Amino acid sequence: VLPVATSLLVKDVKLDTREESKIDENNKEIKQWKRIEVLKDYRFYIMCMTMLAMPWIATGSFVYQSFISSSKEWGPYVIAQSFMAYSILSVITLFISGFLIDKFSSRKLLIYMNIPLLFGTIVLYYFDASLSSFVFFGLVGVTNGLANVLGSSTWAEIYGVKYIGSIKALTTALMVFSTAFGTALFGFLIDIGFTIEDIAFVSGTYIFG
């Protein structure tokens, strides 16, 4: 997902925000996309693949935290304590990502959104110490902070704001589906004998591939 998104999203996309004045100077019209038009745009599906990684991986990890704890032989309160790292880093990233979006634009940040989550799956795959729980959920929190801001601003930048309500409704529905998918997928993989390391590998492969 990351390499494909990198090559496609930072190219010649006309923005409806900071670049509007430049476009107006050249007498170019900014297109306001309707939802049906968005559904016909291949870039939309590539961006969705990037944005939906966080919901299904994080939800699966939250729901099956007892399985993760037993597999890693962590104490009963380790993951609960790790949520502090998740929450703190999520909030910090929310503020930082807002500044970065204003400076660089959402489309340029989107390609980096899942990198912390990718490193988190690597940590979960290779390390068993209790500290790795804090690192994993902390990295998930960083991606969560980025995703919460980019999940709104990206669509407005690329597809305009006139029909942003219907577009955002569509992407929110897909996000909800993604969380349900993550829970089902984690459960299925556990039932057929996958270890948490195997699941981390599958998750990391999805992000990178």
Per-region residue spans from a language model:
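Intracellular juxtamembrane helix-capping segments at the cytosolic ends
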Residues: 146-159
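Helix-loop junctions at membrane interfaces in 12-TM secondary transporters
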Residues: 126-136
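A membrane-interface helix-boundary motif in multi-pass transporters
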Residues: 1, 188-207
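Helix-to-loop junctions at the C-terminal end of transmembrane segments
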Residues: 93-105, 190-191
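Structural signature of the two symmetry-related core transmembrane helices
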Residues: 108-123
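C-terminal membrane-cytosol helix-exit motif in multi-pass small-molecule transporters
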Residues: 1-24, 209
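A late C-terminal transmembrane helix in Major Facilitator Superfamily
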Residues: 158-193
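Extracytoplasmic gate region of multi-pass secondary transporters
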Residues: 36-97
